[in-house]
């Protein structure tokens, strides 16, 4: 009888280990940690086009980043992915980014998310969570600035680079600030 309990326990343990190996969540965790995933809301065509163009720039300029675009179903899903720490970099309209930072409607159910600005692109901001390392943020801004002319003029407006205006309501990431101070 003791032998049966041991065999059941071993069988259950083996099954649990085998099933755990097929969890898509672990694969997603590894996937997103080995790539720069630029998140955009599928409901905002401009942000999708910007994220797509920026992902291509980062893939060329920073090949080790393995940059890709990911589309969230809508802006609220985008905010949830960033707030939960699943993804770190996104393209948002400035008003939306400010609402996320303040924990205001329509994103209040996610609480306040400590977003930081990397760059301004037309009416949109490229934002990240404040935990993004300073050197990584610097490299992203530098790459974006160096290849600014590759972005569609209709997307960037009259801006000559990604430097945000002084009136920005979402603070700059320290790595971005360092880049802009050295390249004024």
Q: Model-flagged regions — what are they?
A:
Residues 5-25:
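N-terminal export signals
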Residues 33-44, 67-70:
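Short, well-ordered beta-strand elements
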Residues 40, 118-136, 165:
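A bilobed periplasmic-binding-protein/Venus flytrap-type ligand-binding module shared by bacterial periplasmic
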Residues 47-63:
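Short, polar/charged alpha-helical segment
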Residues 52, 75-90:
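Short helices/loops that flank or line small-molecule/ion binding pockets
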Residues 63-80:
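Short helix-initiation/N-cap motifs at beta->coil->alpha
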Residues 88-109:
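A ligand-binding cleft/hinge motif common to bilobed small-molecule-binding domains
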Residues 149-184:
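An extracytoplasmic/periplasmic, membrane-proximal ligand-sensing/linker region
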């Amino acid at each position: 009888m003791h032998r049966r309990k041991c065999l059941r326990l071993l069988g259950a343990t083996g099954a649990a280990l085998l099933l755990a190996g097929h969890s898509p969540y672990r694969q997603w965790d590894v996937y997103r940690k080995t790539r720069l995933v630029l998140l955009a809301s599928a409901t905002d065509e401009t942000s999708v086009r910007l994220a797509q163009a920026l992902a291509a720039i980062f893939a060329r300029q920073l090949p080790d980043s393995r940059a890709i675009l990911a589309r969230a179903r809508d802006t609220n899903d985008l905010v949830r992915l960033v707030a939960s720490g699943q993804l770190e970099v996104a393209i948002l309209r400035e008003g939306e980014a400010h609402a996320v930072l303040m924990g205001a409607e329509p994103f209040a159910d996610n609480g306040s998310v400590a977003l930081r600005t990397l760059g301004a692109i037309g009416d949109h901001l490229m934002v990240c969570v404040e935990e993004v390392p300073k050197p990584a943020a610097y490299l992203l801004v530098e790459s974006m600035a160096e290849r600014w002319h590759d972005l569609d003029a209709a997307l960037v407006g009259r801006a000559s680079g990604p430097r945000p205006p002084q009136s920005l309501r979402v603070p700059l990431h320290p790595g971005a600030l360092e880049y802009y101070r050295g390249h004024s």
